[in-house]
């Protein structure tokens, strides 16, 4: 069985590399880690994955991105992969966006950046979400 995907989306390449590094360090043995630099690029990736009948376990999206913000992206992502766990990342105490996301996107979690150390602030959250996803996951 093919490994499911984790997708992370952030327009800041340095931040994106850091997220990818943290994800690979912990999850590469069980998941395929993908990254995208915009909501538009990420939606193309999600569509390709769906067309191949592969699964996305988790989507991490930055809130503040040009063209399409994190909430707008996650709304569209949910249409393509409704079962994926959705996490909104923000560097700001952007409670308005968080409330909108929780209501509109059925957001699973809201994470503040930076989350160093990831062992304390990132992995426990993602472990719980991935456990939930696996509990509901029914491979075709």
Predicted features along the sequence, with ranges:
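Short amphipathic alpha-helix used as the core "switch/output" element in two-component signaling
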Residues: 44-48, 71-85, 100
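Alpha4 helix (beta4-alpha4-beta5 surface) of REC/receiver domains from two-component response regulators
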Residues: 68, 72, 79, 92-112, ...
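Active-site residues of response regulator receiver
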Residues: 10, 61-62, 90
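Helix N-cap/capping motif at the beta->alpha junctions
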Residues: 20, 35-48, 70
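Active-site beta3 strand of CheY-like receiver
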Residues: 7, 50-60
